[in-house]
Amino acid sequence: MAAWGRRRLGPGGGGSRERVSLSATDCYIVHEIYSGENAQDQFEYELEQALEAQYKYIVIEPTRIGDETARWITVGNCLHKTAVLAGTACLFTPLALPLDYSHYISLPAGVLSLACCTLYGISWQFDPCCKYQVEYDAYKLSRLPLHTLTSSTPVVLVRKDDLHRKRLHNTIALAALVYCVKKVYELYAV
């Protein structure tokens, strides 16, 4: 594997990549072991316990629950990005377009940003799954004990701090709300 080879560093660097062992508190594996008719419920319970225990890495072997979790995280990411991009469009459109026409783009973009931020806040903000992202980096995946798995396509979640991300989309959505209220007041009150 290429991930096991030497890493090229800039001038003066000569380090090599080594396989880093993870402690038991870093990684949790939801194994795909069907031991009864309620196996799916057991997988979901194990995943929920792992999320609440805040493991750095969670490996999900069962395909169905892994795919559902990855989709849930993807939808949350989409809402976050839409809130940020629509809010940014709302705030910067008046700078790029004539003032007479900018509200045709900035007001709907502001409403979209606020709607996505609100939906994220209601549905995702307090879900322990929102603290995780799906890991695709081959080098980081090579550090995990994936050789012990029975599934060939596990979903790997990595815990990431989302405080700055939440602050960003909340701040932009709030600024978009303030702009929209100001613009609606100017359009209809004056």
From Swiss-Prot:
Superkingdom assignment: Eukaryota
Matches recorded under InterPro entries: TMEM11
One GO cellular component term: mitochondrion
Any one Pfam family match given in the protein's UniProt record, by short name: Mito_morph_reg
Keyword Mitochondrion belongs to the record: yes
Membrane topology reported for the UniProt record: Multi-pass membrane protein
UniProt keyword RNA-binding, yes or no: no
Record keywords: Membrane, Mitochondrion, Mitochondrion inner membrane, Transmembrane, Transmembrane helix
Localisation per UniProt entry: Mitochondrion inner membrane
Gene Ontology terms describing biological process: mitochondrion organization
Transmembrane segments: 84-100, 107-124
Alphabetized PANTHER family for the sequence: PROTEIN PM1, TRANSMEMBRANE PROTEIN 11, MITOCHONDRIAL
Subunit description: Associates with the mitochondrial contact site and cristae organizing system (MICOS) complex, composed of at least MICOS10/MIC10, CHCHD3/MIC19, CHCHD6/MIC25, APOOL/MIC27, IMMT/MIC60, APOO/MIC23/MIC26 and QIL1/MIC13. This complex was also known under the names MINOS or MitOS complex. The MICOS complex associates with mitochondrial outer membrane proteins SAMM50, MTX1, MTX2 and DNAJC11, mitochondrial inner membrane protein TMEM11 and with HSPA9. Interacts with IMMT/MIC60.
Family: Belongs to the TMEM11 family.
Function, in words: Plays a role in mitochondrial morphogenesis.
Protein name, UniProt field: Transmembrane protein 11, mitochondrial
Organism: Mus musculus
